UniProtKB/Swiss-Prot annotation:
The protein's name: Dihydropteridine reductase
Binding annotation for NADP(+): 13-37
PROSITE patterns membership: ADH_SHORT
EC number of the protein: 1.5.1.34
Annotated organism of origin: Sus scrofa
Entry-annotated residues carrying Phosphoserine: 172
Reactions that this protein is recorded to catalyse: 5,6,7,8-tetrahydropteridine + NAD(+) = 6,7-dihydropteridine + NADH + H(+); 5,6,7,8-tetrahydropteridine + NADP(+) = 6,7-dihydropteridine + NADPH + H(+)
Record text on subunit structure and interactions: Homodimer.
An MF annotation (GO) of this entry: 6,7-dihydropteridine reductase activity
Root EC class: oxidoreductase
A GO CC annotation given for this chain: cytoplasm
């Protein structure tokens, strides 16, 4: 791609742009002089533009609000990538008192954001563009100790594969790819698990660089791929998950 080789400024939407990974994406792509918009419940001052998500218990309200505001922001402009890096974690088995609350939270953090990002891709992503979704390696199997998390991430995986199918509504040549990490090396994770083996955690910079490569179509997996992100003794590898 001549444009990529020339270092053309790209346009990217980061859903979850104030989270640990989202903030790194905004920083890194702004440093390349790309136009980067953050979509989150709070503004990211480093972003080129912001869409602030209103907190609500109604999915349709939130989806309509974000869709309308992104539409106003972009107009007829298309973006090169939509990176959905929103999410969170909550534990609990089927007997937990917090089961319903945690399932609700996981659904909002993972499925609401992924579904809205997917719809935004059908409206605003360039042909040949990139949509990434945040899955989880753990959700390739049963997750009895974190029921809500596993269900939500499993749904993200299914969504990703659906978007890759014929007549999904995605732009021509665009790719939907889910990244399935184990544990990301974030300040919050270090604080909550201070005695863990950090050499098995994935550095945020690795994912940022991976997204960059995929945006410029370098080593980009095929649409619908579920890419496991596994770090062992400080070395991170990307491996497709097969069923």
């Amino acid at each position: 791609m001549a444009a990529a080789a020339a270092g053309e400024a790209r346009r990217v939407l980061v859903y979850g742009g104030r989270g640990a990974l989202g903030s790194r994406c905004v920083q890194a792509f702004r440093a390349r002089n790309w136009w980067v918009a953050s979509i989150d419940v709070v503004e990211n001052e480093e972003a080129s533009a912001n869409v602030v998500v209103k907190m609500t218990d109604s999915f349709t309200e939130q989806a309509d609000q974000v869709t309308a505001e992104v539409g106003k922001l972009l107009g007829t402009e298309k973006v090169d990538a939509i990176l959905c890096v929103a999410g969170g974690w909550a534990g609990g088995n089927a007997k937990s008192k917090s089961l319903f609350k945690n399932c609700d939270l996981m659904w909002k953090q993972s499925m609401w954001t992924s579904t809205i990002s997917s719809h935004l891709a059908t409206k605003h992503l360039k042909e040949g563009g990139l949509l990434t979704l945040a899955g989880a390696k753990a959700a390739l199997d049963g997750t009895p100790g974190m029921i809500g998390y596993g269900m939500a991430k499993g749904a993200v995986h299914q969504l990703c594969q659906s978007l890759a199918g014929k007549d999904s509504g995605m732009p021509s040549g665009a790719a939907a790819i889910a990244v399935l990490p184990v544990t990301l090396d974030t300040p919050l994770n270090r604080k909550s698990m201070p005695h863990a083996d950090f050499s098995s955690w994935t550095p945020l910079e690795f994912l940022v660089e991976t997204f960059h490569d995929w945006i410029i179509e370098k080593n980009r997996p095929s649409s619908g791929s579920l890419i496991q992100v596994v770090t062992t003794q400080g070395k991170t590898e990307l491996t497709p998950a097969y069923f």
